[in-house]
């Protein structure tokens, strides 16, 4: 797959040895370290990058997830789960700070 973001290409050109080591680590973790099927691994990466607000990674993970066979419905459902898993807890923490100040 081609690089989705010019900054990634720039990083690879400026730091080829670090890039190669990062690629090796990523391959080891993604492909060789556990029993999860490929589609589930990409679905997890999509959810993690979205929850972490890493939009460049999210775009890449969606593309690779689609290549692994994820449907738009599966990806959309995973992202929808952010509302309760990320959004509501963030609200509750902010609300607790607000209430504590009164």
What does each model-identified segment do?
Residues 1-40, 93-102:
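Acidic, glycine/proline-rich low-complexity segments that act as flexible tails and inter-domain linkers
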